[in-house]
């Protein structure tokens, strides 16, 4: 089974990917964590690292090339990244999930995770980061990140907690592939 999980920052993709990975005993590969680690290794904020990635396409292209290779060659995995669903284009039987949540909810989650000082500061950084990413995806791949038509499931993580969202996804997944 191959599952991709995508969504904007703070939507809950990493949490839900971990839960899906644990439940179905699938390997988890998270590009978001790779990107955060790369920013931290350089002593940069995500916004600053994103701005650097705008000027240096090799950062995104390397991450995305790696994702594409993984989804095309490896079974039994959850691939979590903003573009995971797009990277799975042409691969049969991949379940593509998009997790969404309103901007203010996502910013509150990011603020808790990143331990930032000011909500307004985090809001500005998140908006800037999303603009930066959308621009890069459009320029590099012609992808409109707001077009959710490629996804099999789109679910709002604000309406349910992570375990309820997992339960909803499990029902959908089990209906497609049968219970594990």
Curated annotation (Swiss-Prot):
EC assignment: 2.7.4.25
Biological process terms in GO annotation: pyrimidine nucleotide metabolic process
Organism: Methanosarcina acetivorans (strain ATCC 35395 / DSM 2834 / JCM 12185 / C2A)
Domain of life: Archaea
Ligand binding (ATP): 7-15
Entry keywords, A to Z: ATP-binding, Cytoplasm, Kinase, Nucleotide-binding, Transferase
CDD domains, A to Z: CMPK
Stated family: Belongs to the cytidylate kinase family. Type 2 subfamily.
Reactions catalysed according to its record: CMP + ATP = CDP + ADP; dCMP + ATP = dCDP + ADP
Name of the protein this chain belongs to: Cytidylate kinase
GO-annotated molecular function: ATP binding; CMP kinase activity; dCMP kinase activity
Compartments (UniProt record): Cytoplasm
Gene3D superfamilies for the chain: P-loop containing nucleotide triphosphate hydrolases
Pfam family, one: Cytidylate_kin2
Cellular component terms (Gene Ontology): cytoplasm
